[in-house]
Design a protein with these regions (language model features):
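Short alpha-helical transmembrane segments in multi-pass integral membrane proteins
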Residues: 1-24, 82-149, 180-183, 187-248, ...
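N-terminal transmembrane alpha-helices
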Residues: 11-49, 62-77, 81, 106-113, ...
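Transmembrane helical elements of multi-pass membrane transporters/channels
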Residues: 22-41, 143, 177, 209-213, ...
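Helix-terminus/linker motif at the lipid-water interface of multi-pass membrane proteins
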Residues: 36-54, 124-131, 187-197, 255-285, ...
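Alpha-helical transmembrane segments of multipass membrane proteins
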Residues: 39-42, 114, 122, 156-160, ...
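Interfacial/gating helices of multi-pass transporter permease domains
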Residues: 45-65, 131-136, 199-204, 239-246, ...
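Small-residue-rich hydrophobic transmembrane alpha-helices
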Residues: 54-114, 151-170, 279-337, 341-343, ...
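Short runs within selected transmembrane alpha-helices of multi-pass transporters and secretion channels
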Residues: 75, 144-162, 170-178, 202-217, ...
Length: 467
């Protein structure tokens, strides 16, 4: 407990800039390695199997957000409860966090496995996929859904480690699982490729590495003497409700990304055909990977914002918000510049046909141009989650795939004969508008905290004067 107290004091006293580096750097490095899970699967599929396999992994990828969404809801919600409880020294809530997490994982993962395996093909058909791409995607996705419990428990419990401030250990464990997958995937693909099961081999490698990772996380919370431990597997209604309230926005962000990407693939099929689905598959993989460092920084921001807010240090919350938002924008710049300068090289990671790559270069630049503003958007969602303001976080989560993108993708391709090029443009406009909304909500929230602090100080001064 002494080490937990020391970490709490560092979060409450260290300068925001230094805090950003110390909390975020391990998370960024670890999550980049973690992101190589699906990124490498797509590269291996395209380079070792073929274009149809690359397309199959791409259309299946959005549906993996079902598990990512559940893990995010359970993990981010629980981590928010934990960090605020640590800040407020609420030991009862701290002791209940892991029991709730285990129960939620067991129930929700079982449901996803049953439904996902049964309805994998109809789900994939929603993207407009046909023929070999649909058949391969179905086999791949069913195997991924069979590993739901492993990936959900591993990811959500890892978020608890981060909520405790154990960022280096959390990222090291997740990175180990990702490296295992990168080693196993080509071995399984090459071993099964001649039997026509190369893509199934990639899926099996992913599930096996996630199972190992889940076992390590279980050992950590059962055997290690940490702030949050698995002592009693039971659900507390109060903690469960708070986890759901805060975590639903994290789940919405993931699940509605599924909706957005499914709509993109459907629009690509209608306006362009299978080749444009493959191009969008490569572009979305690159964008998703570029988002990962931003979410890594958000993992450092979450305990900083939540712990300071729980301790009533509202000015530090504001200063940390500014520091992390600037840092996230700088981080986004590191990905934005190469994407703008070398789009051919980026697309060629997944696509071996030079003519197809050349076909998508200009549209890829348009698609990626608004990514530069996404760091602020991610910090905004994390801020609202950390403060327990699930409604604002949910608003941002809903805005991107539904409130903004759906009307734009219906309108823009029909303007001036843009067609398929309008689908790419609709994605960029959506992200630009979302960043503006996030900034406005963050400014309003920080001003509200400042005014609330001023009112509290005035009341306390008045009571002191009367006494």
């Amino acid at each position: 407990m002494a080490s937990s107290e020391n970490k709490r004091e560092l979060i409450l006293t260290r300068s925001p800039g230094r805090l950003m580096v110390s909390l975020s750097l391990p998370a960024i490095v670890g999550m980049v390695v973690i992101g190589l899970y699906t990124f490498v699967d797509a590269i291996y599929a395209g380079q070792l199997i073929g274009v149809d396999a690359m397309g199959a992994v791409s259309i299946a990828y959005p549906f993996t957000f079902i598990n990512s969404g559940l893990a995010a809801m359970i993990g981010m919600g629980s981590a928010s409860v934990l960090s605020r409880a640590i800040g407020a020294r609420d030991q009862k809530s701290i002791d209940q966090v892991m029991g709730n997490l285990v129960v939620m994982n067991l129930v929700l993962s079982l449901a996803v496995t049953v439904v996902g395996v049964a309805f994998a093909r109809p789900l994939l058909a929603l993207t407009g996929a046909e023929g070999a791409m649909l058949d391969l995607g179905e086999c791949y996705l069913r195997i991924i859904f069979l590993g739901s419990l492993f990936v959900n428990f591993a990811q959500s419990s890892n978020m608890i480690m981060r909520g405790e401030g154990e960022l280096a250990s959390a990222m090291g464990i997740m990175a180990g699982g990702a490296i295992l997958n990168m080693v196993l995937a080509p071995v399984f693909i090459l071993a099964l490729r001649d039997q026509g099961l190369g893509l199934e081999g990639a899926a099996c490698a992913t599930v096996l590495s996630q199972a190992v990772l889940a076992g390590v996380m279980l050992w950590w919370f059962v055997k290690r003497e940490k702030t949050a431990r698995i002592v009693r597997v039971a659900a507390s209604r109060a903690v469960l409700a708070e986890v759901a309230k805060v975590g639903v926005s994290a789940m919405l962000m993931q699940v509605l990304t599924l909706v957005q990407q499914a709509i993109i693939y459907r629009a690509a099929a209608e306006w362009g055909g299978a080749e444009w689905q493959v191009l969008f598959g490569a572009a979305l993989r690159i964008q998703s990977f570029a988002f990962i460092p931003l979410w890594g920084m958000s993992n450092g921001f979450q305990p900083a914002a939540g712990t300071n807010y729980g301790a009533g240090l509202y000015d530090r919350v504001r200063r940390c918000t500014v520091a992390f938002s600037l840092g996230a924008t700088g981080l986004a710049l590191l990905f934005w510049i190469p994407a703008m300068l070398f789009p051919e090289a980026a697309l060629s990671l997944f696509i071996t046909d030079p003519a197809l790559v050349a076909q998508g270069v200009d549209d890829f630049r348009v698609f990626f141009v608004a990514y530069l503003a996404m760091g602020v958007m991610v910090m905004g969602i994390t801020l609202f989650q950390s403060l327990g303001k699930g409604g604002l976080a949910a608003l941002l989560a809903l805005a991107r795939p539904l409130l903004l993108f759906v009307p734009l993708v219906l309108i823009v391709p029909n303007l001036g004969g843009l067609g398929i090029h309008g689908v790419w443009l609709a994605c960029a406009i959506t992200d630009g508008l979302l960043a503006l909304i996030a900034v406005a909500l963050m400014v309003r929230t920080c001003r509200g905290m400042w005014k609330g602090r001023a009112r509290t100080a005035a009341i306390e001064e008045g009571e002191a004067a009367r006494a």
